[in-house]
Structures are given as C-alpha cells and as structure tokens.
Regions:
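Conserved N-terminal phosphate-binding loop of PLP-dependent enzymes in the Aspartate aminotransferase
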Residues: 2-6, 10-406
Length: 406
C-alpha cells in the first residue's frame, strides 16, 4: 500500500516537473533499494545553505521544516563546518571505554548553561527519551521505593517521542489522561514520572493552556513524581527561549534534548538531571558506543554557542511574531486555525474543502518546503537565522499558494 502511495505521489509530481528533471531517477532508486517507511514530499535536495535548499535541478526553496527543528542554526553553518573539519582530523570516536579530551568540556558547558548537575549523552531524540524513562523507573525503585516491576511513567495524550517499541507503546488513552486524568495518574503512588512535550510537535504544534506546565510541576512536587520535559523539538531557542519550559518559569527534573544540539550536522542528544536522579544509574547499566564521542561533543559545544552568540532565541520571538501575524491574514476558507510559539508554527487546513497534501505540493512548486502532520496541519518552522525580509518573501509565496485554493 505504502509503495503504491509513494509511486502515485511520484507520478503526480513528475507531471509537474520539466522533462529534464533529475528527481525521478533519485526517487525511483530510493524506492527500489530503501525501505518504504516514509512518504516524503517529492523533491530531491542536493545542497543547502542558511535558510535555503536547492534540489538536483538547481531550484531554490525556503526550508520551512528545518529537518523537524534540527537545523535551528541554519544549514551548513560555517562555524559548525569548521569544528567538524578540525575535530574529524584529530579524533572522532573512542567509545566510553576510555576518557577523551572533549567530553568533559562539553559536560561542563551544557550543565552550567542549563543549570543541571549532570548530563548523559546519547545520539537520537528517542534514545534520550528512553534514557529518561529508564532513569525515572530506576529512581522510583531506589529512591521512591516503588515495589519492583510496579513503576509507571505517565505520558500526555497525543504524545510523540519516536518510533521505538517503548515510544509507540506509550499510552494516549483519553479516558486515562484527558481532563482530570493526569491528576489521577500522577497521584498513583507507583507513578515514577510524567513525561510531556512543552508544545506537542508531531501532534500538530499543540500549545498547552496557560498555567498547564506550572500545574504539572505542582502535581509532581505534591506526589513525589519526576517531571520529564521532552525538549527535543521545542528546545534550543525554537520557541523563543533556550528551553520552551522557560516560558512558564518551571524547572523539570529531567530534560531531554536532541535535533538542534548539533545544528543538523551529526546525531547528538542529551539527558540532563540533578545528581539525586542521574546517579541512580551505575557503570554498565546504560550507555552508547557513540554517545559523548569527541566529534559530537565538539559540535554540541559550538552549536550551543551559536544559539547564544547569535541571539537566536530573541530572533525566534521577533520573527515568529511577524510570521504568525501574517499567517492569521490567510483566507479562512482554507486556513481554519493558526497556532504556535516563536518559530514553531502551523496552519490547520480545512480538509473538507481542500486536500492538505495538495497544499504541501503547491507550496513546493512555489518555493516553500514544508510537510503536513496529522493530515490537515502544515508546520512552518524555518531556521532561526531567518530575517524580516526573508519572512516577508516566504510569506508572499505561502499567501500566493493558499489563495490559489480559494
């Protein structure tokens, strides 16, 4: 079924491309030899710089997905390219069987920046989330004294933190977690932690009600439950603060980071917590061959410095407000809702009137690359280096596209 859908998409796209387009060759080869676990927008990207990408035919696009917010610093940031070249010529991997000369520097930098005692390095966002869950369960048995094999971790409805077995098994039953459900679940004496995205990304840029995260913090304090904030997509300046939870002035017990921690150049993720949580993990109980490697550590330090020194949180706030204001002027016949924070924004398409996938394809034709989620929601999340002129230029293309469906 997925193969047929993918091929139909490609055929449909091919009719809109020039006869000399190179894209079908690359797409067909990928479909022939690669697993069909994605249904991408039919464009083949060859190079990128800053907020722009170019396809194999040389056409330029605004990147309004940023690899799901991994490229906050912009594509191929020269400072990141420089440290990658320098470190890769010196030392790339030792595994954690030995110390290396960069990892400690990275640990000190990120823990002092985000004000946690310890960091546990991993590679992908889902690895970081699973590490956080594992930490919470170990803490529940060792510190909270939950009976063995009884510890629970509560997840928000519509959560998404990856596609591993643990991630897809996280319950999103509305009867358990809707309304007063979180209160009942957190008050269970066997509950180890509550895991939540400050803004749900894959669910469609769902921004919680004011006071929600403060309420979570208060409930977790009351019932001795760990508060885990999944900042893999929302963190690192995307929403206008270094961490999204900073908007609500709350401090989670565990924070997970990924994506923009490397500026889109290398798989790097992290779990941050204080000693009373982190030190329940003993040598040999958790780890990763690549986690904390010298190359990843050097990249992460530089990626964080870029966010700070280029004032990307402030720019995300400024340009996000500008973009949201403009998006709200789009025709209501097509766009039912606009939502977001900072430069993590989305429009909700009225799918009774317009096919959202056709909107995505039309945006591509007009020079905007984005992707829909949950069918009718199109996410707009450009690199945080975008300026006012570029926001205005990109919006004119978005507006042109949306108005073509009226």
């Amino acid at each position: 079924m997925l193969s047929r859908i993918c091929r139909q998409t490609i055929r449909g796209a091919a009719t809109k491309t020039v006869p000399s387009s190179k894209a079908p060759f690359y797409i067909e080869r990928e479909l022939k030899y690669g697993a069909h676990n994605y249904a991408p927008v039919p464009v083949v990207i060859e190079r990128a710089k800053g907020i722009y990408v170019w396809d194999v035919d040389g056409k330029q696009y605004f990147d309004f997905l940023s690899a799901y917010s991994a490229v906050n610093q912009g594509h191929c940031h020269p400072r990141l390219v420089k440290v990658i070249k320098e470190q890769s010529e010196k030392l790339t991997l030792t595994a954690r069987a030995f110390h290396n000369s960069v990892f400690g520097e990275y640990c000190e930098f990120i823990t002092k920046l985000l004000k946690y005692d310890k960091v546990l390095p991993m590679n992908t966002g889902v690895e970081a989330a699973e590490t956080a869950v594992k930490l919470a369960r170990r803490w529940a048995y060792d510190v909270k004294k939950v009976p063995e094999n009884k510890a629970k971790v509560v997840f928000a409805n519509d959560n998404f933190w990856g596609r591993s077995i643990a991630a897809i098994s996280a319950s999103t039953d509305p009867d358990s977690y809707g309304g007063f459900g979180p209160f009942k679940a957190i008050s269970d004496p066997n509950t180890a932690a509550f895991h939540v995205e400050p803004i749900q990304g894959e669910a469609g840029i769902v921004v919680p009600s004011p006071g929600y995260l403060k309420g979570v913090r208060e409930l977790c304090n009351k019932y001795n439950v760990l508060f885990i904030a999944d900042e893999v997509q929302t963190g690192l300046c995307r929403t206008g603060k270094m961490l999204c939870v900073h908007h609500d002035d709350v401090r989670p017990d565990i924070v997970t980071l990924g994506k923009a921690l490397s500026g889109g150049t290398h798989p790097v993720s992290a779990v941050l917590a204080d000693d009373h949580v982190m030190l329940v993990i003993k040598p040999g109980q958790h780890g990763s061959t690549y986690g904390g490697n010298p190359l990843a550590s050097r990249i992460a330090i530089e990626a964080l410095k870029i966010l700070i020194e280029e004032n990307l949180a402030e720019n995300a706030t400024k340009q996000g407000e500008r973009l949201m204001k403009k998006l709200r002027t789009l025709p209501k016949e097509v766009v039912k809702e606009v939502r977001g924070k900072g430069l993590l924004t989305a429009i909700v398409i009225d799918k009774k009137k317009v096919d959202p996938w056709k909107v995505v394809l039309a945006l591509k034709e007009n020079g905007i690359l984005s992707k829909n989620t949950h069918g009718d929601i199109i996410r707009f999340a450009p690199p945080l280096i975008i300026n006012e002129k570029q926001i205005d230029e990109a919006f004119s293309l978005i507006e042109k596209t949306i108005k073509s469906f009226v």
